[in-house]
Amino acid sequence: MTTETFVKDVKPGLKNLSVLFIVLETGRVTKTKDGHEVRTCKVADKTGSINISVWDELGNFIQPGDIIRLSKGYASLFKGCLTLYTGRGGDLQKIGEFCMVYSEVPNFSEPNPEYIAQQSQSKQGQQESGTGTNNHNSSSPAPPASDLENGNGSNSSGPPAHQSTAPAHSASGRITRSQPNHSLPGAPNSVSNGKESRRTGKR
């Protein structure tokens, strides 16, 4: 049996997810070019809320207040927003109604500047080069990456305002953004770590 994942722990690219949630809202049905029906539902657990995209007849059975277990689901970005999907072998099983502790905030499906920057970096890297090694090297000097690094290490007044608007995302984002800076010892021109440049200036 797969261990259950909390909504706060869902990240883009994760697969084989098992998530227990309550349905808060069911969105309207949209039709794809292929004739499939897609419904986006807002769901939550005690750690926050997220959108789930439900395809075809499964969407007709989901009602607000349903407590559902997603099995073999996956997470991906849709228009820069984190979204859960059922996947090919995925399953939604109703296990109850109404009685579940949940929190609507933070909403992990709100547009996250960190995810948008990652998407633009990967698209820019794919346009510049098709290889994975050049992809990593070419994405670091891109303007979106420097904006993220400035919010992490410099004393500029602009980026901290963005961090305060989404405290749940910035706390986790701050950790992930600082890790690549420490793994690039040969990049002294980056603005990522102001402490190192101050130490070398005093010596």
From Swiss-Prot:
Does the UniProt entry include the keyword Zinc?
no
Q: Where is the composition biased (Low complexity)?
A: 118-140
MF GO annotations: DNA binding; single-stranded DNA binding
Q: Which family does it belong to?
A: Belongs to the SOSS-B family. SOSS-B1 subfamily.
UniProt entry keywords in alphabetical sequence: DNA damage, DNA repair, DNA-binding, Nucleus
Does the UniProt entry include the keyword DNA repair?
yes
Query: Where in the chain is the DNA-binding region found?
Result: 22-92
Q: Can you list the GO cellular component terms from the UniProt entry? A: nucleus; SOSS complex
List every stretch annotated Disordered. Answer: 110-203
Q: What does this protein do?
A: Component of the SOSS complex, a multiprotein complex that functions downstream of the MRN complex to promote DNA repair and G2/M checkpoint. In the SOSS complex, acts as a sensor of single-stranded DNA that binds to single-stranded DNA. The SOSS complex associates with DNA lesions and influences diverse endpoints in the cellular DNA damage response including cell-cycle checkpoint activation, recombinational repair and maintenance of genomic stability. Required for efficient homologous recombination-dependent repair of double-strand breaks (DSBs).
Q: Which domain of life is it from?
A: Eukaryota
Instruction: Enumerate composition-biased segments (Polar residues).
Output: 149-182
Tell me the compartments it is located in: Nucleus
Q: Which InterPro entries match?
A: NA-bd_OB-fold (IPR012340), SOSS-B (IPR051231)
What is the name attached to this protein's record? SOSS complex subunit B1-A
How does this polypeptide assemble, per the annotation? Component of the SOSS complex, composed of soss-b (soss-b1/nabp2 or soss-b2/nabp1), soss-a/ints3 and soss-c/inip. SOSS complexes containing soss-b1/nabp2 are more abundant than complexes containing soss-b2/nabp1.
- What are the recorded Gene Ontology BP terms? DNA damage response; DNA repair; double-strand break repair via homologous recombination; mitotic G2/M transition checkpoint; response to ionizing radiation
